[in-house]
Protein backbone atom coordinates (compact mmCIF):
# COMPACT_ATOMS: atom_id res chain seq x y z
CA UNK A 1 0.00 0.00 0.00
CA UNK A 2 1.54 3.31 -1.08
CA UNK A 3 1.47 6.53 0.95
CA UNK A 4 -1.21 8.15 -1.22
CA UNK A 5 -3.64 5.32 -0.54
CA UNK A 6 -2.69 5.29 3.13
CA UNK A 7 -3.57 8.97 3.44
CA UNK A 8 -6.82 8.71 1.47
CA UNK A 9 -8.03 5.71 3.48
CA UNK A 10 -8.10 7.86 6.61
CA UNK A 11 -10.42 10.37 4.91
CA UNK A 12 -13.10 8.07 3.52
CA UNK A 13 -16.72 8.90 4.47
CA UNK A 14 -19.07 6.39 6.05
CA UNK A 15 -21.70 7.08 3.36
CA UNK A 16 -22.94 4.52 0.83
CA UNK A 17 -21.46 4.78 -2.65
CA UNK A 18 -19.18 3.28 -5.28
CA UNK A 19 -15.40 2.96 -5.15
CA UNK A 20 -13.14 2.82 -8.20
CA UNK A 21 -9.72 1.14 -8.05
CA UNK A 22 -7.04 2.25 -10.55
CA UNK A 23 -3.65 0.87 -11.57
CA UNK A 24 -0.35 2.66 -12.24
CA UNK A 25 -1.60 3.73 -15.69
CA UNK A 26 -4.69 5.38 -14.15
CA UNK A 27 -6.82 2.62 -15.72
CA UNK A 28 -9.95 1.50 -13.87
CA UNK A 29 -9.42 -2.13 -12.86
CA UNK A 30 -12.28 -2.66 -10.42
CA UNK A 31 -15.57 -1.01 -9.46
CA UNK A 32 -17.40 -1.92 -6.27
CA UNK A 33 -20.31 -0.72 -4.15
CA UNK A 34 -20.53 -0.29 -0.40
CA UNK A 35 -23.05 0.51 2.31
CA UNK A 36 -20.15 2.09 4.19
CA UNK A 37 -17.33 3.30 1.93
CA UNK A 38 -14.82 3.67 4.75
CA UNK A 39 -15.19 0.11 6.03
CA UNK A 40 -15.38 -1.53 2.61
CA UNK A 41 -12.41 0.17 0.94
CA UNK A 42 -10.21 -0.20 4.02
CA UNK A 43 -10.93 -3.94 4.08
CA UNK A 44 -8.93 -4.40 0.85
CA UNK A 45 -5.74 -3.29 2.57
CA UNK A 46 -6.15 -5.19 5.84
CA UNK A 47 -5.80 -8.87 6.62
CA UNK A 48 -5.43 -11.75 4.19
CA UNK A 49 -7.48 -12.37 1.05
CA UNK A 50 -8.05 -15.07 -1.52
CA UNK A 51 -5.76 -15.32 -4.55
CA UNK A 52 -7.98 -13.25 -6.84
CA UNK A 53 -8.34 -10.38 -4.36
CA UNK A 54 -4.60 -10.42 -3.60
CA UNK A 55 -3.93 -10.02 -7.33
CA UNK A 56 -6.33 -7.06 -7.48
CA UNK A 57 -4.84 -5.33 -4.42
CA UNK A 58 -1.30 -5.74 -5.78
CA UNK A 59 -2.24 -3.60 -8.79
CA UNK A 60 -4.09 -0.81 -6.96
CA UNK A 61 -2.15 2.47 -7.10
CA UNK A 62 -5.03 4.87 -6.41
CA UNK A 63 -8.77 4.92 -5.86
CA UNK A 64 -11.73 7.28 -6.21
CA UNK A 65 -15.24 7.16 -4.84
CA UNK A 66 -18.70 8.57 -5.58
CA UNK A 67 -21.10 9.15 -2.71
CA UNK A 68 -24.75 8.15 -3.21
CA UNK A 69 -27.88 8.64 -1.12
CA UNK A 70 -28.75 4.96 -0.67
CA UNK A 71 -27.51 1.40 -1.12
CA UNK A 72 -29.84 0.91 -4.08
CA UNK A 73 -28.30 3.94 -5.82
CA UNK A 74 -24.84 2.52 -5.17
CA UNK A 75 -25.84 -0.81 -6.70
CA UNK A 76 -27.28 0.77 -9.84
CA UNK A 77 -24.33 3.13 -10.24
CA UNK A 78 -21.98 0.15 -9.94
CA UNK A 79 -23.85 -1.56 -12.79
CA UNK A 80 -23.48 1.52 -15.01
CA UNK A 81 -19.78 2.05 -14.25
CA UNK A 82 -18.91 -1.59 -14.89
CA UNK A 83 -20.73 -1.64 -18.22
CA UNK A 84 -19.07 1.59 -19.30
CA UNK A 85 -15.48 0.84 -18.19
CA UNK A 86 -15.29 -2.98 -18.40
CA UNK A 87 -12.78 -3.32 -15.51
CA UNK A 88 -10.58 -6.41 -15.76
CA UNK A 89 -11.48 -7.70 -12.28
CA UNK A 90 -15.26 -7.25 -12.61
CA UNK A 91 -15.73 -10.54 -14.48
CA UNK A 92 -19.12 -11.34 -12.99
CA UNK A 93 -20.84 -8.19 -14.24
CA UNK A 94 -19.11 -7.61 -17.57
CA UNK A 95 -21.93 -9.13 -19.60
CA UNK A 96 -24.47 -6.74 -21.07
CA UNK A 97 -27.32 -8.12 -19.03
CA UNK A 98 -30.24 -5.69 -18.93
CA UNK A 99 -32.07 -4.85 -15.73
CA UNK A 100 -35.83 -5.03 -15.29
CA UNK A 101 -38.34 -2.21 -15.69
CA UNK A 102 -42.06 -2.11 -14.91
CA UNK A 103 -44.09 -1.03 -17.92
CA UNK A 104 -47.66 0.20 -18.39
CA UNK A 105 -48.50 -0.92 -21.91
CA UNK A 106 -50.02 1.47 -24.43
CA UNK A 107 -53.16 -0.56 -25.12
CA UNK A 108 -56.84 0.31 -24.95
CA UNK A 109 -56.99 -1.80 -21.81
CA UNK A 110 -53.40 -1.53 -20.50
CA UNK A 111 -51.46 -4.15 -18.57
CA UNK A 112 -48.66 -3.99 -16.03
CA UNK A 113 -45.71 -6.09 -17.20
CA UNK A 114 -42.02 -6.59 -16.38
CA UNK A 115 -39.58 -6.11 -19.25
CA UNK A 116 -35.82 -5.91 -19.72
CA UNK A 117 -36.03 -3.90 -22.94
CA UNK A 118 -36.82 -0.18 -22.95
CA UNK A 119 -38.23 0.76 -26.35
CA UNK A 120 -38.99 4.20 -27.66
CA UNK A 121 -42.71 3.52 -27.75
CA UNK A 122 -45.47 5.39 -25.94
CA UNK A 123 -45.62 2.96 -23.04
CA UNK A 124 -44.62 4.18 -19.58
CA UNK A 125 -41.44 2.69 -18.07
CA UNK A 126 -40.36 2.76 -14.42
CA UNK A 127 -37.08 1.54 -12.96
CA UNK A 128 -34.66 -0.03 -13.54
CA UNK A 129 -34.74 -2.32 -10.54
CA UNK A 130 -31.64 -4.13 -9.23
CA UNK A 131 -33.08 -7.56 -9.98
CA UNK A 132 -36.23 -9.23 -11.22
CA UNK A 133 -37.16 -10.17 -7.65
CA UNK A 134 -37.38 -6.51 -6.66
CA UNK A 135 -39.40 -5.71 -9.78
CA UNK A 136 -41.81 -8.59 -9.07
CA UNK A 137 -42.25 -7.45 -5.47
CA UNK A 138 -43.33 -4.00 -6.66
CA UNK A 139 -45.57 -5.43 -9.38
CA UNK A 140 -47.33 -7.67 -6.84
CA UNK A 141 -48.02 -4.60 -4.74
CA UNK A 142 -49.34 -2.71 -7.77
CA UNK A 143 -51.59 -5.65 -8.70
CA UNK A 144 -53.18 -5.46 -5.25
CA UNK A 145 -53.67 -1.70 -5.48
CA UNK A 146 -54.68 -1.22 -9.14
CA UNK A 147 -57.01 -3.66 -11.01
CA UNK A 148 -55.38 -3.72 -14.45
CA UNK A 149 -56.16 -6.56 -16.83
CA UNK A 150 -53.87 -9.55 -16.37
CA UNK A 151 -54.67 -11.74 -19.39
CA UNK A 152 -53.05 -11.26 -22.79
CA UNK A 153 -56.12 -12.74 -24.51
CA UNK A 154 -59.40 -11.88 -22.71
CA UNK A 155 -61.17 -15.04 -21.40
CA UNK A 156 -64.83 -15.85 -22.02
CA UNK A 157 -65.71 -15.62 -18.32
CA UNK A 158 -64.33 -13.79 -15.33
CA UNK A 159 -60.92 -15.00 -14.18
CA UNK A 160 -59.38 -15.78 -10.81
CA UNK A 161 -57.97 -12.24 -10.49
CA UNK A 162 -61.49 -10.80 -10.76
CA UNK A 163 -62.50 -12.69 -7.62
CA UNK A 164 -59.38 -11.38 -5.84
CA UNK A 165 -60.35 -7.82 -6.75
CA UNK A 166 -57.26 -7.43 -8.93
CA UNK A 167 -59.03 -7.27 -12.32
CA UNK A 168 -62.20 -5.56 -13.59
CA UNK A 169 -63.00 -8.21 -16.26
CA UNK A 170 -63.42 -5.37 -18.71
CA UNK A 171 -64.69 -7.40 -21.67
CA UNK A 172 -67.43 -9.07 -19.64
CA UNK A 173 -68.36 -6.22 -17.29
CA UNK A 174 -68.06 -3.58 -20.05
CA UNK A 175 -65.63 -1.24 -18.26
CA UNK A 176 -65.01 2.09 -20.04
CA UNK A 177 -61.46 2.41 -21.39
CA UNK A 178 -61.28 5.91 -19.86
CA UNK A 179 -61.23 4.23 -16.44
CA UNK A 180 -57.96 2.50 -17.32
CA UNK A 181 -56.41 5.72 -18.63
CA UNK A 182 -57.10 7.32 -15.26
CA UNK A 183 -55.80 4.20 -13.53
CA UNK A 184 -52.58 4.40 -15.54
CA UNK A 185 -52.11 7.99 -14.41
CA UNK A 186 -52.55 6.91 -10.78
CA UNK A 187 -49.94 4.16 -11.18
CA UNK A 188 -47.54 6.58 -12.86
CA UNK A 189 -47.97 9.02 -9.97
CA UNK A 190 -47.45 6.21 -7.45
CA UNK A 191 -44.25 4.97 -9.11
CA UNK A 192 -42.93 8.53 -9.24
CA UNK A 193 -43.30 8.69 -5.47
CA UNK A 194 -46.63 10.55 -5.32
CA UNK A 195 -48.20 8.01 -3.00
CA UNK A 196 -49.51 10.13 -0.10
CA UNK A 197 -53.13 10.07 -1.30
CA UNK A 198 -53.06 6.30 -1.78
CA UNK A 199 -51.70 5.78 1.74
CA UNK A 200 -54.35 8.12 3.14
CA UNK A 201 -57.11 6.15 1.35
CA UNK A 202 -55.71 2.84 2.65
CA UNK A 203 -55.59 4.18 6.20
CA UNK A 204 -59.24 5.18 5.88
CA UNK A 205 -60.15 1.70 4.64
CA UNK A 206 -58.11 0.09 7.42
CA UNK A 207 -59.90 2.17 10.05
CA UNK A 208 -63.27 1.35 8.50
CA UNK A 209 -62.52 -2.38 8.43
CA UNK A 210 -61.34 -2.33 12.03
CA UNK A 211 -64.47 -0.47 13.11
CA UNK A 212 -66.57 -3.10 11.33
CA UNK A 213 -64.53 -5.75 13.18
CA UNK A 214 -63.18 -7.11 9.85
CA UNK A 215 -59.73 -7.53 11.33
CA UNK A 216 -58.27 -9.71 8.56
CA UNK A 217 -59.15 -7.09 5.95
CA UNK A 218 -57.76 -4.34 8.21
CA UNK A 219 -54.52 -6.34 8.50
CA UNK A 220 -54.34 -6.58 4.68
CA UNK A 221 -54.62 -2.79 4.41
CA UNK A 222 -51.97 -2.41 7.12
CA UNK A 223 -49.61 -4.72 5.21
CA UNK A 224 -50.20 -2.74 2.01
CA UNK A 225 -49.28 0.51 3.78
CA UNK A 226 -46.11 -1.09 5.17
CA UNK A 227 -45.19 -2.45 1.73
CA UNK A 228 -45.52 1.01 0.20
CA UNK A 229 -43.27 2.38 2.92
CA UNK A 230 -40.49 -0.08 2.14
CA UNK A 231 -40.59 0.89 -1.54
CA UNK A 232 -40.32 4.63 -1.03
CA UNK A 233 -36.57 4.68 -1.60
CA UNK A 234 -36.08 6.63 -4.81
CA UNK A 235 -32.99 6.04 -6.84
CA UNK A 236 -31.42 8.87 -8.87
CA UNK A 237 -28.61 7.28 -10.83
CA UNK A 238 -30.80 5.96 -13.65
CA UNK A 239 -33.52 7.91 -15.41
CA UNK A 240 -36.54 6.70 -17.32
CA UNK A 241 -36.41 8.99 -20.36
CA UNK A 242 -33.15 7.68 -21.94
CA UNK A 243 -31.88 11.26 -22.33
CA UNK A 244 -28.20 12.19 -22.63
CA UNK A 245 -27.51 14.91 -20.09
CA UNK A 246 -24.63 16.45 -18.15
CA UNK A 247 -25.28 17.32 -14.51
CA UNK A 248 -23.18 20.11 -12.98
CA UNK A 249 -22.60 20.80 -9.30
CA UNK A 250 -20.00 22.89 -7.51
CA UNK A 251 -18.78 23.76 -4.03
CA UNK A 252 -16.44 26.51 -2.80
CA UNK A 253 -14.35 26.86 0.35
CA UNK A 254 -11.11 28.63 1.37
CA UNK A 255 -10.67 30.25 -2.05
CA UNK A 256 -11.01 26.95 -3.93
CA UNK A 257 -13.77 25.61 -6.14
CA UNK A 258 -14.58 21.99 -6.98
CA UNK A 259 -16.79 21.25 -9.99
CA UNK A 260 -18.33 17.82 -10.47
CA UNK A 261 -19.93 16.81 -13.76
CA UNK A 262 -22.02 13.65 -13.96
CA UNK A 263 -22.40 12.20 -17.45
CA UNK A 264 -25.82 10.59 -17.88
CA UNK A 265 -26.09 8.64 -21.13
CA UNK A 266 -29.22 6.79 -22.23
CA UNK A 267 -30.62 7.52 -18.79
CA UNK A 268 -27.61 6.00 -16.95
CA UNK A 269 -24.98 7.79 -14.88
CA UNK A 270 -21.85 6.29 -16.42
CA UNK A 271 -18.96 8.63 -15.58
CA UNK A 272 -17.97 11.78 -13.75
CA UNK A 273 -15.42 14.54 -14.22
CA UNK A 274 -14.01 16.34 -11.18
CA UNK A 275 -11.81 19.44 -11.18
CA UNK A 276 -10.47 21.56 -8.31
CA UNK A 277 -8.99 25.04 -8.77
CA UNK A 278 -8.72 28.48 -7.10
CA UNK A 279 -11.44 30.87 -8.23
CA UNK A 280 -10.98 34.53 -9.21
CA UNK A 281 -14.36 36.28 -9.08
CA UNK A 282 -17.74 35.54 -7.58
CA UNK A 283 -18.12 31.74 -7.47
CA UNK A 284 -21.13 31.78 -9.79
CA UNK A 285 -19.23 33.85 -12.37
CA UNK A 286 -16.23 31.52 -12.37
CA UNK A 287 -18.54 28.52 -12.51
CA UNK A 288 -20.16 29.98 -15.65
CA UNK A 289 -16.70 30.46 -17.17
CA UNK A 290 -15.83 26.85 -16.35
CA UNK A 291 -18.92 25.54 -18.15
CA UNK A 292 -18.03 27.53 -21.27
CA UNK A 293 -14.46 26.24 -21.25
CA UNK A 294 -15.65 22.71 -20.52
CA UNK A 295 -17.36 22.41 -23.91
CA UNK A 296 -14.73 24.36 -25.84
CA UNK A 297 -11.21 23.71 -24.56
CA UNK A 298 -11.91 20.16 -23.31
CA UNK A 299 -13.81 19.20 -26.47
CA UNK A 300 -16.68 17.54 -24.64
CA UNK A 301 -19.68 16.74 -26.79
CA UNK A 302 -22.76 18.71 -25.83
CA UNK A 303 -25.61 16.48 -24.59
CA UNK A 304 -29.32 16.94 -25.21
CA UNK A 305 -29.70 18.61 -21.84
CA UNK A 306 -27.59 20.28 -19.15
CA UNK A 307 -28.68 20.48 -15.50
CA UNK A 308 -27.24 23.27 -13.33
CA UNK A 309 -27.72 24.47 -9.72
CA UNK A 310 -30.54 26.88 -8.91
CA UNK A 311 -28.30 29.92 -8.28
CA UNK A 312 -26.77 29.92 -11.78
CA UNK A 313 -28.02 32.06 -14.70
CA UNK A 314 -29.48 29.51 -17.12
CA UNK A 315 -29.76 32.06 -19.95
CA UNK A 316 -26.03 32.74 -19.74
CA UNK A 317 -25.26 29.01 -19.91
CA UNK A 318 -27.67 28.55 -22.81
CA UNK A 319 -25.99 31.38 -24.73
CA UNK A 320 -22.58 29.72 -24.30
CA UNK A 321 -23.44 26.11 -25.08
CA UNK A 322 -26.50 26.44 -27.36
CA UNK A 323 -28.38 23.48 -25.93
CA UNK A 324 -31.25 22.87 -23.51
CA UNK A 325 -30.39 24.08 -19.99
CA UNK A 326 -32.52 23.42 -16.91
CA UNK A 327 -32.41 24.49 -13.27
CA UNK A 328 -34.53 21.73 -11.73
CA UNK A 329 -36.52 22.74 -8.67
CA UNK A 330 -37.77 19.31 -7.61
CA UNK A 331 -37.86 15.64 -8.50
CA UNK A 332 -35.25 13.29 -9.90
CA UNK A 333 -33.29 15.95 -11.82
CA UNK A 334 -33.01 18.17 -8.75
CA UNK A 335 -31.76 15.17 -6.78
CA UNK A 336 -29.07 14.52 -9.41
CA UNK A 337 -27.84 18.12 -9.13
CA UNK A 338 -27.81 17.81 -5.33
CA UNK A 339 -25.78 14.61 -5.63
CA UNK A 340 -23.21 16.38 -7.84
CA UNK A 341 -22.97 19.23 -5.31
CA UNK A 342 -22.57 16.77 -2.44
CA UNK A 343 -19.71 14.96 -4.22
CA UNK A 344 -18.04 18.30 -5.01
CA UNK A 345 -18.10 19.15 -1.31
CA UNK A 346 -16.65 15.75 -0.36
CA UNK A 347 -13.86 16.03 -2.98
CA UNK A 348 -12.87 19.52 -1.85
CA UNK A 349 -12.82 18.53 1.80
CA UNK A 350 -10.71 15.49 0.94
CA UNK A 351 -8.17 17.76 -0.76
CA UNK A 352 -7.91 19.96 2.34
CA UNK A 353 -7.64 16.95 4.62
CA UNK A 354 -4.88 15.42 2.49
CA UNK A 355 -2.93 18.68 2.58
CA UNK A 356 -3.24 18.85 6.35
CA UNK A 357 -2.03 15.28 6.72
CA UNK A 358 0.93 15.95 4.45
CA UNK A 359 2.14 18.62 6.90
CA UNK A 360 2.68 15.93 9.52
CA UNK A 361 5.23 14.13 7.34
CA UNK A 362 7.24 17.03 5.91
CA UNK A 363 10.60 16.61 7.65
CA UNK A 364 11.34 13.40 5.81
CA UNK A 365 10.01 14.98 2.62
CA UNK A 366 12.48 17.89 2.60
CA UNK A 367 15.39 15.56 3.37
CA UNK A 368 14.39 13.26 0.51
CA UNK A 369 13.93 16.25 -1.80
CA UNK A 370 17.45 17.45 -1.02
CA UNK A 371 18.88 14.01 -1.78
CA UNK A 372 16.85 13.79 -4.99
CA UNK A 373 18.19 17.14 -6.26
CA UNK A 374 21.68 16.53 -4.81
CA UNK A 375 21.55 19.72 -2.72
CA UNK A 376 21.65 20.36 1.07
CA UNK A 377 18.31 19.80 2.81
CA UNK A 378 16.10 22.73 1.67
CA UNK A 379 14.96 23.94 5.09
CA UNK A 380 13.73 27.25 3.62
CA UNK A 381 11.91 27.15 0.27
CA UNK A 382 10.64 30.27 -1.49
CA UNK A 383 8.14 29.88 -4.34
CA UNK A 384 6.82 32.39 -6.91
CA UNK A 385 3.78 32.62 -9.17
CA UNK A 386 2.33 35.33 -11.42
CA UNK A 387 -1.34 36.12 -11.90
CA UNK A 388 -3.15 38.27 -14.47
CA UNK A 389 -6.15 38.13 -16.78
CA UNK A 390 -5.45 39.47 -20.26
CA UNK A 391 -2.73 41.66 -18.77
CA UNK A 392 -5.02 43.47 -16.33
CA UNK A 393 -3.80 44.14 -12.78
CA UNK A 394 -0.72 41.89 -13.13
CA UNK A 395 0.67 40.70 -9.80
CA UNK A 396 3.10 38.18 -8.42
CA UNK A 397 3.31 36.44 -5.07
CA UNK A 398 5.88 34.63 -2.97
CA UNK A 399 5.19 32.01 -0.32
CA UNK A 400 7.75 30.61 2.10
CA UNK A 401 7.95 27.11 3.57
CA UNK A 402 10.27 26.47 6.52
CA UNK A 403 10.87 22.85 7.52
CA UNK A 404 8.13 21.87 5.11
CA UNK A 405 5.48 24.12 6.69
CA UNK A 406 4.10 27.46 5.46
CA UNK A 407 5.62 30.52 7.15
CA UNK A 408 2.86 33.02 6.41
CA UNK A 409 4.58 35.95 8.12
CA UNK A 410 7.20 35.75 5.34
CA UNK A 411 4.70 35.75 2.44
CA UNK A 412 5.03 38.71 0.07
CA UNK A 413 2.78 40.29 -2.59
CA UNK A 414 4.07 42.23 -5.59
CA UNK A 415 2.32 44.65 -7.94
CA UNK A 416 4.04 44.51 -11.31
CA UNK A 417 5.46 47.99 -12.05
CA UNK A 418 7.54 47.80 -15.23
CA UNK A 419 5.58 45.42 -17.48
CA UNK A 420 2.78 46.42 -19.84
CA UNK A 421 0.40 43.69 -20.97
CA UNK A 422 0.42 39.93 -20.29
CA UNK A 423 4.17 39.17 -20.32
CA UNK A 424 4.77 36.35 -17.84
CA UNK A 425 8.54 36.20 -18.45
CA UNK A 426 9.07 39.94 -17.92
CA UNK A 427 6.90 39.86 -14.79
CA UNK A 428 8.97 36.99 -13.38
CA UNK A 429 12.21 38.85 -14.19
CA UNK A 430 11.00 41.97 -12.34
CA UNK A 431 9.82 40.16 -9.21
CA UNK A 432 12.87 37.90 -8.83
CA UNK A 433 15.16 40.92 -9.18
CA UNK A 434 13.16 42.97 -6.66
CA UNK A 435 13.05 40.16 -4.11
CA UNK A 436 16.70 39.11 -4.15
CA UNK A 437 18.12 42.61 -4.57
CA UNK A 438 16.41 43.29 -1.24
CA UNK A 439 17.82 40.06 0.23
CA UNK A 440 21.33 41.32 -0.64
CA UNK A 441 20.67 44.94 0.40
CA UNK A 442 19.07 44.13 3.78
CA UNK A 443 21.17 41.07 4.60
CA UNK A 444 18.15 38.74 4.71
CA UNK A 445 18.47 34.96 4.96
CA UNK A 446 18.45 33.51 1.42
CA UNK A 447 16.41 30.38 0.71
CA UNK A 448 17.91 26.92 0.28
CA UNK A 449 15.72 26.38 -2.81
CA UNK A 450 13.64 28.58 -5.11
CA UNK A 451 10.61 26.93 -6.73
CA UNK A 452 9.07 28.65 -9.75
CA UNK A 453 5.47 27.87 -10.69
CA UNK A 454 6.12 27.50 -14.40
CA UNK A 455 8.07 25.75 -17.10
CA UNK A 456 11.48 26.03 -18.70
CA UNK A 457 11.10 29.67 -19.80
CA UNK A 458 10.23 31.02 -16.36
CA UNK A 459 12.96 28.96 -14.65
CA UNK A 460 15.64 30.16 -17.08
CA UNK A 461 14.59 33.79 -16.47
CA UNK A 462 14.96 33.26 -12.71
CA UNK A 463 18.38 31.62 -13.20
CA UNK A 464 19.58 34.51 -15.34
CA UNK A 465 18.63 37.08 -12.70
CA UNK A 466 19.86 35.11 -9.66
CA UNK A 467 23.11 33.73 -11.02
CA UNK A 468 24.24 36.14 -13.75
CA UNK A 469 22.88 39.52 -12.64
CA UNK A 470 22.96 39.19 -8.84
CA UNK A 471 25.74 36.61 -8.50
CA UNK A 472 23.86 34.42 -6.02
CA UNK A 473 24.23 30.64 -5.76
CA UNK A 474 20.71 29.41 -4.99
CA UNK A 475 19.27 26.21 -6.53
CA UNK A 476 16.19 26.90 -8.70
CA UNK A 477 13.52 24.36 -9.71
CA UNK A 478 10.34 24.61 -11.75
CA UNK A 479 6.94 22.96 -11.31
CA UNK A 480 4.83 22.39 -14.40
CA UNK A 481 1.08 21.66 -14.34
CA UNK A 482 -0.92 19.40 -16.64
CA UNK A 483 -4.07 20.37 -18.57
CA UNK A 484 -6.14 19.81 -15.41
CA UNK A 485 -4.03 22.38 -13.54
CA UNK A 486 -2.48 19.70 -11.35
CA UNK A 487 1.18 19.41 -10.34
CA UNK A 488 2.78 17.30 -13.07
CA UNK A 489 6.58 17.60 -13.44
CA UNK A 490 9.59 18.83 -11.48
CA UNK A 491 12.30 20.56 -13.56
CA UNK A 492 15.86 20.92 -12.24
CA UNK A 493 19.50 20.92 -13.30
CA UNK A 494 21.71 22.57 -15.89
CA UNK A 495 20.42 22.10 -18.50
CA UNK A 496 16.91 21.65 -17.08
CA UNK A 497 15.61 18.10 -17.03
CA UNK A 498 12.52 16.37 -15.72
CA UNK A 499 13.29 14.84 -12.32
CA UNK A 500 11.82 11.37 -11.81
CA UNK A 501 9.51 11.75 -8.83
CA UNK A 502 6.94 9.25 -7.58
CA UNK A 503 3.48 10.82 -7.48
CA UNK A 504 2.83 8.88 -4.28
CA UNK A 505 5.90 10.16 -2.43
CA UNK A 506 5.85 12.68 0.42
CA UNK A 507 8.22 14.98 -1.45
CA UNK A 508 5.73 15.11 -4.35
CA UNK A 509 2.94 15.99 -1.89
CA UNK A 510 5.13 18.74 -0.43
CA UNK A 511 5.84 20.28 -3.84
CA UNK A 512 2.16 19.98 -4.76
CA UNK A 513 1.20 21.81 -1.59
CA UNK A 514 3.75 24.56 -2.24
CA UNK A 515 2.47 25.01 -5.80
CA UNK A 516 -1.17 25.06 -4.70
CA UNK A 517 -0.40 27.56 -1.94
CA UNK A 518 1.53 30.04 -4.08
CA UNK A 519 -1.11 29.80 -6.79
CA UNK A 520 -3.88 30.41 -4.25
CA UNK A 521 -2.02 33.34 -2.69
CA UNK A 522 -1.31 35.00 -6.05
CA UNK A 523 -4.85 34.55 -7.31
CA UNK A 524 -6.37 35.84 -4.06
CA UNK A 525 -4.21 38.98 -4.25
CA UNK A 526 -5.06 39.46 -7.91
CA UNK A 527 -8.77 39.01 -7.23
CA UNK A 528 -8.68 41.53 -4.38
CA UNK A 529 -6.77 44.08 -6.44
CA UNK A 530 -8.94 43.70 -9.52
CA UNK A 531 -12.13 43.80 -7.48
CA UNK A 532 -10.92 46.92 -5.67
CA UNK A 533 -9.95 48.65 -8.92
CA UNK A 534 -13.18 47.69 -10.65
CA UNK A 535 -15.27 48.67 -7.63
CA UNK A 536 -13.53 52.01 -7.18
CA UNK A 537 -13.55 52.96 -10.85
CA UNK A 538 -17.25 52.24 -11.35
CA UNK A 539 -18.27 54.15 -8.22
CA UNK A 540 -15.90 57.08 -8.67
CA UNK A 541 -17.46 60.49 -9.26
CA UNK A 542 -20.70 59.85 -7.36
CA UNK A 543 -21.28 62.88 -5.17
CA UNK A 544 -21.73 61.95 -1.53
CA UNK A 545 -20.13 58.49 -1.91
CA UNK A 546 -16.78 58.66 -0.17
CA UNK A 547 -14.27 55.91 0.69
CA UNK A 548 -16.08 54.95 3.91
CA UNK A 549 -19.45 54.45 2.21
CA UNK A 550 -17.80 52.54 -0.66
CA UNK A 551 -16.18 50.26 1.90
CA UNK A 552 -19.51 49.70 3.67
CA UNK A 553 -21.22 48.87 0.36
CA UNK A 554 -18.54 46.33 -0.57
CA UNK A 555 -18.57 44.79 2.89
CA UNK A 556 -22.35 44.37 2.81
CA UNK A 557 -22.95 43.30 -0.82
CA UNK A 558 -19.58 41.51 -1.43
CA UNK A 559 -19.47 42.33 -5.17
CA UNK A 560 -20.44 44.89 -7.81
CA UNK A 561 -22.85 42.38 -9.32
CA UNK A 562 -24.83 42.23 -6.08
CA UNK A 563 -24.88 46.05 -5.81
CA UNK A 564 -26.16 46.31 -9.39
CA UNK A 565 -29.00 43.94 -8.52
CA UNK A 566 -29.87 45.78 -5.28
CA UNK A 567 -32.82 48.16 -5.05
CA UNK A 568 -32.50 51.75 -3.86
CA UNK A 569 -34.10 50.74 -0.54
CA UNK A 570 -31.56 47.96 -0.04
CA UNK A 571 -28.68 50.39 -0.66
CA UNK A 572 -30.22 52.90 1.77
CA UNK A 573 -30.26 50.18 4.46
CA UNK A 574 -26.43 50.17 4.39
CA UNK A 575 -26.41 53.81 5.56
CA UNK A 576 -26.32 55.57 2.19
CA UNK A 577 -28.60 58.63 1.75
CA UNK A 578 -31.48 58.01 -0.67
CA UNK A 579 -30.28 60.58 -3.21
CA UNK A 580 -26.83 58.96 -3.24
CA UNK A 581 -28.38 55.47 -3.46
CA UNK A 582 -30.38 56.58 -6.51
CA UNK A 583 -27.17 57.93 -8.06
CA UNK A 584 -25.45 54.57 -7.43
CA UNK A 585 -28.31 52.73 -9.15
CA UNK A 586 -28.19 55.10 -12.11
CA UNK A 587 -24.40 54.83 -12.43
CA UNK A 588 -24.35 51.02 -12.32
CA UNK A 589 -27.51 50.51 -14.39
CA UNK A 590 -27.44 53.25 -17.06
CA UNK A 591 -30.49 53.53 -19.27
CA UNK A 592 -30.09 52.73 -22.93
CA UNK A 593 -30.91 55.33 -25.55
CA UNK A 594 -34.06 53.39 -26.45
CA UNK A 595 -35.23 53.38 -22.81
CA UNK A 596 -34.69 57.14 -22.51
CA UNK A 597 -36.62 57.80 -25.71
CA UNK A 598 -39.46 55.57 -24.56
CA UNK A 599 -39.59 57.41 -21.24
CA UNK A 600 -39.70 60.79 -23.03
CA UNK A 601 -42.53 59.57 -25.27
CA UNK A 602 -44.45 58.39 -22.21
CA UNK A 603 -44.10 61.84 -20.59
CA UNK A 604 -45.05 63.63 -23.82
CA UNK A 605 -48.20 61.62 -24.50
CA UNK A 606 -51.42 63.03 -22.97
CA UNK A 607 -52.78 60.96 -20.12
CA UNK A 608 -56.41 59.89 -20.60
CA UNK A 609 -58.36 59.04 -17.49
CA UNK A 610 -61.93 58.34 -16.43
CA UNK A 611 -63.88 60.95 -14.51
Swiss-Prot record:
- The question of whether DNA repair is a record keyword is answered with yes
Which branch of life, at top level? Bacteria
- Give the UniProt entry's GO cellular component terms: cytoplasm; excinuclease repair complex
The record's Pfam families line, in alphabetical order, gives:
GIY-YIG, HHH_5, UVR, UvrC_RNaseH, UvrC_RNaseH_dom
Key word Iron-sulfur present in the record?
A: no
Cite the InterPro entries for this sequence. Answer: GIY-YIG_endonuc, GIY-YIG_endonuc_sf, GIY-YIG_UvrC_Cho, RuvA_2-like, UVR_dom, UVR_dom_sf, UvrABC_protein_C, UvrC
Q: Which PROSITE patterns match?
A: GIY_YIG, UVR, UVRC
SMART domains for this protein: GIYc (SM00465)
Q: Where is this region: Disordered?
A: 587-611
Oligomeric state and interaction partners are given as: Interacts with UvrB in an incision complex.
- Family label: Belongs to the UvrC family.
**What function does this protein fulfil?**
The UvrABC repair system catalyzes the recognition and processing of DNA lesions. UvrC both incises the 5' and 3' sides of the lesion. The N-terminal half is responsible for the 3' incision and the C-terminal half is responsible for the 5' incision.
Q: What is the name of this protein?
A: UvrABC system protein C
Native species: Streptococcus sanguinis (strain SK36)
The gene name on file is uvrC
Amino acid sequence: MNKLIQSKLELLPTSPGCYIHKDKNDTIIYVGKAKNLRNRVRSYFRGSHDTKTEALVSEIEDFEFIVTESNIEALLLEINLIKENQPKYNIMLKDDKSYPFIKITNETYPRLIITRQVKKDVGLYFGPYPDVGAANEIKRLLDRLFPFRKCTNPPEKVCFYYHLGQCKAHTICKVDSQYFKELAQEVAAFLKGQDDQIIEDLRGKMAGAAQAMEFEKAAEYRDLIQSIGTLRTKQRVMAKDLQNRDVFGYYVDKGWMCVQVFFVRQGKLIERDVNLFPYYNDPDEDFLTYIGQFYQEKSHLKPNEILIPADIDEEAVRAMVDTKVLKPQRGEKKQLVNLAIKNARVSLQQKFDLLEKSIEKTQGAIENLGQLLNIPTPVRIESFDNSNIMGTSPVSAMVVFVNGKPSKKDYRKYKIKTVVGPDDYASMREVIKRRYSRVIRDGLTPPDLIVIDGGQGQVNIAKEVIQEQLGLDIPIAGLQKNDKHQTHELLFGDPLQVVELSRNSQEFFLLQRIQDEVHRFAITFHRQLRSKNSFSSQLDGIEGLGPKRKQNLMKHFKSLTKIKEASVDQIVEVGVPRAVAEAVREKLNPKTQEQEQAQLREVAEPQIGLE
